[in-house]
Every structure is written in structure tokens, then in C-alpha cells.
């Protein structure tokens, strides 16, 4: 069995530092690099891609809404076509830096509110898919396991990586529990490790109300802006490899 560990990276901005990219990068196999709209800037993008190349980590674009103040976690009203073009713009920006760093983009993973809305809203999912296909139909689209977007992307012929968040609580619907809900983010590395092992052994994840959800996991996400992200990523990787699971980039699966 094989799986991927991904992390949102390059989410600092100017003098503001978010995450532990230098410590986390050696523990993961795919990096989702912010493209300057919800976080990141040209200097951060360049440094993050160079760091990923140094550690042999595959990279992808992590586009979000134009919302630095809200860190891309607020829903924004958009007109038809805007989400598609927001994503195209950001993929193009990151691709320029990727080319300069001598690396190729592997995937696209929308950020925050855009990601969550695409998981359940047909128009948003359609525009995400259109953007990826317009730029490069060979790119992998990372989206929530079991979501509307995952099914629509597969139907459209895209390569899909179904994503599971071991450090996030799930609703019984399969959606992520809102961050405003108590217990929505799990910080205990041991609890996260137990969830990962249950997932790889049974294909099930326990929801916030104790029910089991069947989830396909092509890639596991660790949130780089959480305290102790480095310890968490290392713990997950060790648990997987000890259980005989090969941890490789999603494009190598």
C-alpha cells in the first residue's frame, strides 16, 4: 500500500512568519505552495520551491481567494468564471517560479474556503476543474475524499487525489467540521496517529460524533500552520512506514 503526505507551505507573507516549513519539508512528500493571494509573496514562493527541490518533495499550486486579511478562510461572493480565472492566474504565477527552480508542478489543491465550497457546490467545483484542465490536464487535482468535486473531476477525466485530514474532525456527512466547532482541530499527535492507523487498516475515519466514515485516502494532509506540525508530520510518517505503508508523492502512485 502507498500513500502521500502533503502540507500547505509558503504561507508566510513579508515579515510575517507562518508555519515551520524548514522543519516540516523533510517529513512530507508533496507541498502545496501558496500563490500570493491568501498568503505567500514572490520571495516566499521562490524560497519554498527551492526548499522543496532540495528535499526532493513534489510541489503543487495552492490557490485561494484574494483574501490576505482572512487567510483565504472566508467565503467570498464571486461572479461566474471568477474562480476559474483566480486559479489560472495563481497556477501561472507559481509555475514561473517552479520553472526557475527546476521543478515541475505535480498538482493543484485549492485553499481554505475555496476548497470547502468546491467540495459541495457544483459551480465552484466546475470552475476549479475547468481551471486545471485549461492549464494542464495532466495535473492532479487534490480534493476532499468522497466529495462532489472529487466525483466531478473524475468524470471530467482529471487525475484525482482523494484527501483525508487526520488532524481535523469530520461531520457524519463527510465534510470537515467547521473550525469554530469545539474539537474541530486535533492537536494531540498520538490521537492523530491512531486515526491514521485506523484509516490505513480499515479505510474508516471516526466522525466527531463517533460514527465511522468510509474514506479513500490517496493523500494525507498535515496543516503546516498548526503548532507542532513538524512533530505531527514525523509521527504520521513513522506510523505509516512502521505499518508497511510506502510514503511517496501522489504522482508516483
Curated annotation (Swiss-Prot):
EC category: hydrolase
CDD domains on file: LamB_YcsF_like
EC number: 3.5.2.9
Primary role: Catalyzes the cleavage of 5-oxoproline to form L-glutamate coupled to the hydrolysis of ATP to ADP and inorganic phosphate.
Summary of subunit composition and partner proteins: Forms a complex composed of PxpA, PxpB and PxpC.
Homology family: Belongs to the LamB/PxpA family.
Protein name per the record: 5-oxoprolinase subunit A
Lineage, highest ranks first: Bacteria, Pseudomonadati, Thermodesulfobacteriota, Syntrophobacteria, Syntrophobacterales
